[in-house]
């Protein structure tokens, strides 16, 4: 089982694009979705409410929001997902299947824009991540709860 933790602040224009694809996993009971909101002033919470399992309110600080979400989740495997990030469900299903073997990881980044400069940027972000075993939040970091 997987807990997907999504820190948000004023994401009402983007949040459904992130949450709707995850509903298949939620329906199959293979994940819980926790939204930790940083005191949004828009309709982010209202829009997200039907599509998440828990909504928590926190100060607006991504690391604090992620830690709060991790502290209340019920599963051992955590995935931190930015509210503006689309994720490949097949990749998520693969990490769920390998749950007991995973300590931490990240996905390769791919931008929606196909211009050369974005292809160049994603290539070097992914290369850096592979060479230095270093992922960023935009790459959907995942880890076991016990990982230090």
Q: What is the predicted role of each segment?
A:
Residues 6, 30-39:
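Short beta-strand/loop segment that forms part of the nucleotide-sugar
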Residues 74-75, 138-148:
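Conserved nucleotide-sugar donor-binding
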Residues 90-117:
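Conserved donor NDP-sugar-binding/catalytic core segment of glycosyltransferases
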Residues 10-25:
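Short, well-formed alpha-helical segments that are part of the catalytic scaffolds
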Residues 43, 83-96:
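Acidic donor-binding/catalytic loop of UDP-sugar-dependent glycosyltransferases
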Residues 57-73:
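Glycine-rich, basic loop-to-helix element that forms the pyrophosphate-binding segment
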Residues 78:
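Short aromatic/hydrophobic "clamp" motif used to bind/position activated sugar donors
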Residues 21, 37-45, 85-86:
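A conserved acidic beta->alpha catalytic loop
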């Amino acid at each position: 089982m997987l807990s997907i933790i999504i820190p948000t602040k004023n994401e009402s224009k983007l949040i459904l694009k992130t949450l709707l694809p995850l509903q298949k996993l939620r329906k199959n009971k293979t994940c819980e979705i926790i939204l930790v909101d940083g005191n949004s002033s828009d309709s982010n919470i209202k829009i997200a409410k039907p599509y998440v399992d828990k909504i928590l309110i926190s100060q607006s600080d991504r690391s604090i929001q992620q830690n709060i979400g991790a502290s209340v989740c019920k599963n051992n495997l955590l995935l931190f997902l930015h509210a503006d990030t689309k994720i490949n469900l097949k990749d998520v299903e693969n990490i769920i299947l390998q749950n007991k073997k995973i300590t931490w990881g990240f996905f390769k980044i791919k931008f929606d824009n196909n211009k050369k400069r974005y292809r160049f940027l994603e290539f070097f972000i992914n290369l850096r991540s592979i060479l230095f075993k270093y992922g960023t939040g935009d790459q959907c970091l995942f880890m076991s709860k016990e990982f230090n």
